[in-house]
Amino acid sequence: MGKRCYLVTFRQIDPFFVIDVEKPSKPKVLGYLKIPGFSGYLHPYDDNHIIGVGRENTNVKISLFDVSDVSAPTEMSKYVMRGGWSDTPVLSDHKSFLFDRSRELLVFPVTIQGWEKYPEWQGACVFSISLSKGIMFRGGISHQEPYPSQLEEDYFVRRTLYIDEVLYTMSNKKIKMNNMENLEPINEISL
């Protein structure tokens, strides 16, 4: 972003680096932060804040980093998915990541084993994200049958988008429409 580069290494303790790249022949580490886990995908929130999606132990972790003081970046908020294990395609496919700062909206697909009353769950996880409130889980939208004995890959949510006040989630077999405010179902289309 601009004259700065943000990156992480993939270790058990995740150094989040802020690097000055104004002179490409002489990059310089301005600051770093060591925290548990790692961020496999970094996305700008604004000029002084970065969203990180990655892992902490065996679960998906979302971080909001404050880089306004480049010499001492901080993790100002984080959310770690509950359950025994979780994964997200965001770590290998940035197009599965939906973010709109003006709506405080963050949405992406997650697969979870051992989550609440479900032995397995897959769907779009919806979060609110802001500098004042941090990261908060709002709910999940799945295309799977309730309480499946096995998840069906054709019903894995792959993409999300919104138009006006409707959130659309898409899998190979279905498109669901939900109210953006309360996530209540509006309609669905089988493909």
What are these regions (language model features)?
Residues 1-191:
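Feature marking well-ordered beta-strand scaffolds used for ligand recognition
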